[in-house]
Amino acid sequence: MAIFLDTGVLYALHDTADVHHLDASAIVLHALRGKWGSPYLSSYVTVETTLMLKSRLGWAAARAFPNPVKEMGLKELVVDEETHGRALAMFAEGRRELGLTDATSVLFMDALGIGAFATFDRRRFGRLAQDVVGEGYSKSLSDEERDEVARFSKAGAPS
């Protein structure tokens, strides 16, 4: 059992003004507690998240991001040459209109049997996993859980 975290979730976790910040905080908090098993992301998701943070929030936010990934206990899968080649082929074929990073995510999920996917892009990824969590997730929580998420969010995703 495991969950794969998409770029948008990790970006929203670090951008307190993002419309999905509370959902991202709740998803990551529950992922870290093992609700779906081990939380995974790929090295390409790390790169993509870092680029988004730099372009939208500046250098300080971008430079702070990779350290919390390891500190938080997220498992980062490094894209090797074979996975990169297969992802490039998927990207070139235009399968599901996936970007290169998204294609690597699909390949890792398939290879590892990851059944849950955290994303705010349900249109593109809604059928990629048995369990897709994202927008509105925080609304499904109890008041006590929402309070915990608010504390986690205020403490800040480590950055």
Name each region found by the language model.
Residues 1-41, 54-64, 140, 145-146, ...:
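Short, well-structured N-terminal submotif of metal-dependent ribonuclease cores
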Residues 51-54, 110:
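Short glycine/serine- and small hydrophobic-enriched flexible loop segments
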